[in-house]
Each structure stands twice: as C-alpha cells, then as structure tokens.
Amino acid sequence: QALLEYFISKAHENSIVLFPHSRVVIGIPSGATEVEKRAVYDAAMAAGARETYMILEPAAAAIGAGLPIESDMGNMIVDVGGGTTEVAIISAGGIVISRSLRVAGDELDQDIIEYIRSKYNLFIGEQMAEKVKIAIGSAYPLNEEKTVDVRGRNLITGLPEAIEISSIEIREALSPSIQVIIDTIKDALDESPPEILADLMDNGICLTGGTAQLQGLVERLSNEVRVRVWVAEDPMTCVARGCGMVLDDLDLYENLLVGIERDPYTNTQG
C-alpha cells in the first residue's frame, strides 16, 4: 500500500486540479485468488485511488508488447517477471488459456544461492546472486563461456571468502527452474485448439519481463517447444506500458478487466 501511495502522490504532483480524480490500472497474476484480488483493490483504494481497475498481467504484457490481441488469430505471451511467470494464449480480445507459476527471476536467484551454498559451502546474498545471474546466467550453452568472482561467507569458517564460478555451473543451477517454465509452455500448447496452435506456429511466442533477457533463454525455449520465440522491445516495462494503454482506453479493453466478487464499492469493479 505504501508503494501505491507513493506512485499515486507522484501522479498528483503535476495536477492542476485541486482534488485530482485518480484512476489506477493494476496488473495481477492470472493465478490470483479472490482474496488476493480484493487485497490489491483495497490497498489501491486506501492509497488514494478513486477508481481501481485490474487486468491480468499476461494480458497487460501482450498489450504493452504490441500484440494484436483483438485479432482472431492466436498469440502466445510468456511474461517472466520477478515473482511469477505468466503463460497465456490470447485470441479475439480474450484469454483462451492461462497459467501462472511462482518460478521466475526471484526463484532463479534462490537457485544460485542454494547451488553455491551446496557446492562451495559459501553463503551469498540475494543481491550477489542477482549480479551473478545477470553477468553469467544462461539457459543455453554460450559461444564463449564466462566466469565471475563471487564473494560471500564461508559456512564452515565463518570468514569472508571469494571464489570463481563459471557460466556452465550457473546454467546447471538454473536448469531445473527453466525446465518448469518450459513444461508449462508445453502444457499450454498441448491444450490449444488446433486452429489456434496453427496461428502460434506462424506468430511465435513473445517473451516479456525482466528475466526474458536471460542469456540463451530464447534459444532454449525455441529448441524445446519447436516454436519461434522472440523478445518484445523493452520487455521489462511491457506490463506497465500495457496498463497505461488500458487506462487510456478503458472501453476498448473492458472485456479484459478483472472483476472481484461481492464488491461493496459502487464506483468500480464488481
């Protein structure tokens, strides 16, 4: 809620209206429960929003990536963020199939932490793990493998220690979680109607989210699912851009807005 209050207040700073009328569009995971949806809605209202709308993150990502979601042709979006990976197939302005899993960038950081702890008896923090992931993390063999120095605390001696670790090792650490994402994509493809599957073979799979930039992820996915995979422009901001586009034209995207059950408020969702 504090974060929402900050952004809403920032939006008000340049307002010339004495009592600004804030409208907010928030992206939520497709696996969010009714309780979680209500919590997000209530937090936004308590933070100062006057109208709060919610949209599933994969739909927002697809809009922000510029996919023709209103077309009858099927499009697939895979949004690999920090906390969740959202897999969705969209056609004719609606979500045909969606999957949400809590395996994404944060989980990859934990994979690195656990791998280094197990193999080297070295404890590193989340920031160091993320730096390693960005520097040498990969999902597919690199043309030139890399190494990086990692600093942490030796779990046996309790003393600071530095080791050199390779991109091959980090790829090994990340591989199980990457495979979970791949299997989820395969499951969604297996459930797709034949006509939509044909569209996906033509259109490919669009990757968004910060983790979409992981080295070799496109190659690994393409090889495993046998469908062309491509990364959207500025993938990290696709969900935010999509939410902004929805806010600018709520009528156009009305069918993609997410309602909440038993809404006591009269001015928005319900």
Language-model-derived ranges and their functions:
Residues 1-80, 88-205, 212-270:
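Nucleotide/phosphate-binding catalytic cleft detector across ATP-hydrolyzing
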